[in-house]
Amino acid sequence: VKRDAFAMPKGIYLDGNSLGPMPHLARAAVERRLRQWAQEGVNAWEDWFDLAERLSPALARLVGASASEVVATGSITANLHALLATFYRPDGERRNLLATELDFPSDLYALRAWAERLGGELRLVPSRDGHSLETRDILANLTPDIALAWLPTVLYRSGQRLDVRAITAAAGARGILSGWDAAHSVGAMPHRFHDDGVDFAVWCHYKYVNAGPGAPAGLFVHDKHTGVRPGLPGWWGHDKASQFEMSSDFRPAEGAGAFQIGTPSILATAALEGALEVFENCSLEAIRARSLELTDVLIALVDEQLPEVSVRTPRQHEARGGHVALECRSARRISLALRERNITADFRPPNLLRLTPVALYNTEAELEEAVTVLRELLTASARREATNSPGKDAPPRVT
């Protein structure tokens, strides 16, 4: 536990899968860059110019890659567009894209747009229960018409973790490129993108990496694709040594750096710079082990005290991500009532609560208190429904 490394919000914070709390090192890094701007003006670009590249070794450690295979840039959706513009090349029968019906909507928007643009279709792997996916169903949909498969490492609603290695290997054996959205896993567990043969991946840094709202996302391209020119070139992806020659000919940077497009936000990148320092002396294996301990405790407490609540997150460790999804009546109302009691969780329509005990800062005692309060709120909600008394309602505003 590194709780003292963070400026923790009041109460019990169980929403790190939406937005992690602010590390003190992130504040310090942003303030340092602000001072540079104030004191040096444009001359500070001498230091800022390759800031993203200097963060690549730390990013590489998070996802199991070499530094040249990763870069901090853009957002998840913008990076997905850049990857699709590069690697989605319909050819004869092999012209369709594959995703799942449980993917985060923004991914599906991007995938469908490229399929429509290039004359393909977006095929969706169905869920048997509306919460989880079967590996066998994913493999069965890796058919000869699929050019590229795009999948989440961890499902954003239920918290199910998919088998990246097995699915990637199966796709590769069938000549299908595989890409992954790792938004709900990076920072919560180790990854092996290079060794697993993942073709490309994206993720955010504002959840488990705690780099702040709108933090630069991450992008991975396996070095087996070295030499592939980005489909959405921009001047920040130009070879750094000759970028300011201002040539009209695009000469891509080495590796994933070529997929940068425009000038980055230095202040947002600075927050990421500070947030990554928190992980310098942390074992990702230890973070994962602690996460599983905490989610085990939470699931056991729910089983014991909340019999009317269904746990929709897999109980098997190998299939579980970092958050626990609870299905219950009046979930939206309950999530708001929790916040009134200084317990921050979140809601997903129509009836899911997501609670995230994060290894770096949450404790068993917090989980015990949260479930005790949940018990009180569920009892009160049942009484309210019995008397047809309305309660507060509001849409969620976080991912």
Question: Whereabouts are the PLM-identified features?
Answer:
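Pyridoxal 5′-phosphate
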Residues: 1-399
